[in-house]
Amino acid sequence: MTEVKLDHPGGQLSMPVNTAIEGPAGIGVSQLLKQTGMTTYDPGFVNTAACSSGITYIDGDAGILRYRGYPIEQLAEKSSFLEVSYLLTYGELPTQPQLTEFTERIRRHSLLHEEMRRFFDGFPRDAHPMAVLSSAVSAISTFYQDSLDPFDDEHVEMSTVRLMAKVPTIASYAYKKSIGQPLLYPENSLGYVENFLRMTFGVPAEPYEVDPVMARVLDMLFILHADHEQNCSTSTVRLVGSSNANLFASVSAGVNALFGPLHGGANQAVLEMLETIRADGGDVRSFVRRVKDRQAGAKLMGFGHRVYKNYDPRATIVKKAAQDVLGRMSNSDPMLDLAMELEEIALADDFFVSRRLYPNVDFYTGLIYKAMGFPTKMFTVLFALGRLPGWIAQWREMIKDPETKIGRPRQVYTGAAQRDYVNLEQR
C-alpha cells in the first residue's frame, strides 16, 4: 500500500493512501489525532474526503460529470429521469422489464394519506414551498412506522419507492397551497414528470394538457440535477444518516440544506441579476464594468463553481434547452438575449477567464423554469425533485458501507482558557 509520511513535532507518521479509480486519491488520517495529538483543519471540507463512493465522478478541471460511469451528456440526451434514478440507486442501467417494474411501483405509491391534507392546512398561505417540502417529507414517515429500519433491505426499498413517488405530490401541494388553489390527486396514467406538471398547474374545473416538449425539458433538467457527488445537501443526508436516522429524516435534512441560498438559490439570483440589467436599460457591458470595478450591488451570478474550473458540462445542455423552450414562446423573453450577451462578453474577457469563471448549470435554468410558469420560490423545490434520487442513492451507499461511522467532526478550540465562576453579586 502506498503511504505518505508526515513529519510532526513528536516524530514521523506514516499514513495510507486510498487510491481512486479516477480523480484524487485520499490520505488516510484516521490515526492522526491518536499519534500526533493534532487534527486536520479544513474549513468547508475543501480538501477532505468524508467517504468513498462509486456513484458520481466529477473532474472539475476538465468539465466532466458522470453518473455510475456514464457521461451526463449521454444520459441527458438518451435517458429518462426514472431510468437515471434507477441507475443511481442500483448501480446499473435497467433492462426494460426492470424499468417497467420500477416505474409501476413508483406510480402505485404517488397518493398521499388523506390526513396529510390537514397537515398542509396548518401552514400559512405564504409559507415557502421548501419549508413545506422539508416538513412534509419528515411527516410522511409517521404513516409508515413499521418500515423505517435502515438495515432492513425491504424497508429501505419501500422507503425509496415511497419517497420517489410522493415527493412530486408534496411539491405540487406546497405550490397549490401558496396560491390558494385546491389540491389535485395524482393521475397515474401519466408519466412521472407529466403527472407533476398536471398536479402543479391543473385545476379541477377543466382538463390540463401537458406540453410534451416542456415535460421532456423538465425531465432532462431533473437528470442534470440528479446527483453531484458530496455537495452540501448530499453530505448533510449522509451525516444525518450516519446516526442511523431513517431515509425520510435524512432526506428532509437534505432539503433544508438545499434551502440555503448559497446552495439552492443561485438560479433565482441569476434572474434577479438579469432583471436588474434590464431595469437599468439593458446595457450588459456597463453591468460587466461595474462587476469588474466591484461596485456595490453588481455581482455576476451563475458564473463559477466550487468544483468546476472549466465550463460546467450541464450548462451547455441547459443553454440549448433554454433556446429551444423560449424559442417556442409566442413572445420571446428579452432576458434570454441578455443572458446570452452576458455570457458572450464574460467569456471573452480575461478578467473572468483568468479567474476561471464560466457559466454553471444555474445560469439558464431559472429562465426555463420561468418560461414554464413556475414562480421563483419553486425553483429550489424543482432542484430538490431532481436531486432526490441522488440523495437516496448516497444514503443507501452510506448505510451499506462498512467504514461508515457516525459523523463527528473535530474542531480547533479558540475560546477562553479555564477560568473560575464568579458569583452574580460580585460581577
Give a label for each model feature:
Residues 1-427:
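Non-transmembrane, aqueous-exposed alpha-helical and coiled segments at domain scale
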